[in-house]
Amino acid sequence: MVHWTQEERDEISKTFQGTDMKTVVTQALDRMFKVYPWTNRYFQKRTDFRSSIHAGIVVGALQDAVKHMDDVKTLFKDLSKKHADDLHVDPGSFHLLTDCIIVELAYLRKDCFTPHIQGIWDKFFEVVIDAISKQYH
């Protein structure tokens, strides 16, 4: 089990509440597809794919993770199974996306996005990635 300090919980929940995370994740997806073009392969068959629509799905899952920070693995069990067994997403792609989300958050909050704050977000996303990758093991 991950230990969360009150400062970490506050940073993550306040940022989610006070930031247009759908825009942040849309921009992060667009960045990921541009910088790491092979990640687009999961969406090429979907002619109606738009980053903004998928961003809404991602943000919904992340909001749930924020609400259940102490039990993300249980929360993401079915989502992990879907990504592993049905979608066959390379789990390395999760790292690429979360790195791009952190870049977008840093750009948006440049005056207050310190290395310490980045560390909090790295920790949060490592927990999320571990949970969504659980069924791959």
Swiss-Prot record:
Occurrences of domain Globin (ranges): 3-137
Gene Ontology cellular component terms for the protein in this record: blood microparticle; haptoglobin-hemoglobin complex; hemoglobin complex
Coiled coil: none
Molecular function terms, GO-annotated: haptoglobin binding; heme binding; metal ion binding; organic acid binding; oxygen binding; oxygen carrier activity; peroxidase activity
Tissue expression notes: Red blood cells.
Record has Transport as a keyword: yes
Signal peptide annotation: none
GO biological process, one term: hydrogen peroxide catabolic process
Residues that coordinate or bind heme b: 54, 83
Annotated keywords: Heme, Iron, Metal-binding, Oxygen transport, Transport
Oligomer and partners: Heterotetramer of two alpha chains and two beta chains.
Protein role: Involved in oxygen transport from gills to the various peripheral tissues.
Family the UniProt entry places it in: Belongs to the globin family.
Protein name (database record): Hemoglobin subunit beta
Lineage of producing organism: Eukaryota, Metazoa, Chordata, Craniata, Vertebrata
Gene designation: HBB
